[in-house]
């Protein structure tokens, strides 16, 4: 019997498991694969305007994300420096493997039992969750269950107009659990995010781009006075779209799931996809494109 059982070992799941374990609870952490803890999805960055301060607030409560980001940072940038400190946006580009390793190290410092499997249903006693059931039929009892499945609940991915059931590129979606949660009347809404394309750096003429080096000041997200490993800092770069780019995007709008009527989820308010930028701000002669190390 666990005091706290956490489903999902992404950012939220790991934070929940650690917070419970530090309070003396017997904690189980369930994930699809043994090496999933701290796995970064989409764009491997932490922070930014409207987000970096949240990472630091997590750190105030002894969270993991800030410390892992500091250990994995390969590019640091304090955004909005031209404005007052209250709206500065600390942001790092992280090395995926270093970030995952940092989270794993922090998890291993606490008595958290790791469980590999897919939770296919919740066992209910009235309105109370008393256990979870894995895909192989294993029943795990718990006094409380934290659902931290992130993007995996009945998730879909689109590659052009091709739709696949996936929680992350190449990984399956948690369909049975999502179906049960709908059956018991839990409200659900889809969110939409776009994954930036990956480019082979050897095919890019870097000399024609505007370099964006890492900040000279090696600031940290975390206030913990711990020694950090020396991680080489890499450069990002900036370029811009052109009128020709916009014309090509407009001609290909019917190949975008966003405008083909396939996307149901609500996209991020301040980070529209490039085709959305061209449609909404078509009067501009160019939009910034950031090239970041992966």
Where are these regions (language model features)?
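Glycine-rich nucleotide phosphate-binding loop and flanking beta-alpha elements
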Residues: 13, 140, 152-154
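Beta1/beta-strand and adjacent pyrophosphate-binding region of the FAD-binding site
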Residues: 1-12
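Conserved beta-strand-loop-beta-strand element in the redox core of flavoprotein oxidoreductases
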Residues: 123-139
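Conserved N-terminal/central alpha/beta ligand/cofactor-binding core
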Residues: 18-124, 144, 148-168, 172-177, ...
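C-terminal catalytic lobe of FAD-dependent flavoproteins
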Residues: 253-294
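Redox-cofactor binding/interface segments in oxidoreductases and associated redox assembly factors
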Residues: 7, 134, 147-148
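Short alpha-helical segments and helix-capping/turn motifs at coil-helix boundaries
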Residues: 11-15, 100-102, 129-134, 176, ...
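Core beta-strand elements of the Rossmann-like FAD/NAD(P) dinucleotide-binding domain
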Residues: 2, 135-144
């Amino acid at each position: 019997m666990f005091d706290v059982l956490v489903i999902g070992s992404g950012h939220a799941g790991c934070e929940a498991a650690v917070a419970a374990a530090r309070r003396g609870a017997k904690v189980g952490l369930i994930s699809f694969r043994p090496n999933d803890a701290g796995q970064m999805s989409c764009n491997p960055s932490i922070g930014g305007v409207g987000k970096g301060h949240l990472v630091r607030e997590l750190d105030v409560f002894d969270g993991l994300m800030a410390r892992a980001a500091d250990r994995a940072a390969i590019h640091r940038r304090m955004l909005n420096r031209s404005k007052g400190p209250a709206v500065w946006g600390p942001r790092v580009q992280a090395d995926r493997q270093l970030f995952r390793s940092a989270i794993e190290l922090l998890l291993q410092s606490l008595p958290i039992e790791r469980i590999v499997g897919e939770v296919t249903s919740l066992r209910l006693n009235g309105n109370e969750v008393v256990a979870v059931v894995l895909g192989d039929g294993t029943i795990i009892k718990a006094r409380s269950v934290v659902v931290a499945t992130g993007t995996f609940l009945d998730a879909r991915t689109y590659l052009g107009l091709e739709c696949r059931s996936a929680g992350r590129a190449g990984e399956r979606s948690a369909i049975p659990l999502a179906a049960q949660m709908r059956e018991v009347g839990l409200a659900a809404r889809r969110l939409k995010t776009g994954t930036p394309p990956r480019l082979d750096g050897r095919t890019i003429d870097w000399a024609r781009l505007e370099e964006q080096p890492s900040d000279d000041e090696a600031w940290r997200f975390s206030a913990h006075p711990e020694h950090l490993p020396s991680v080489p800092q890499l450069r990002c770069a900036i370029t811009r779209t052109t009128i020709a780019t916009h014309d090509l995007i407009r001609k290909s709008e019917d190949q975008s799931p966003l405008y083909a009527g396939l996307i149901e989820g609500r996209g991020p308010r301040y980070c529209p996809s490039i085709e959305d930028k061209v449609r909404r701000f078509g009067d501009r002669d160019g939009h910034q494109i950031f090239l970041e190390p992966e």
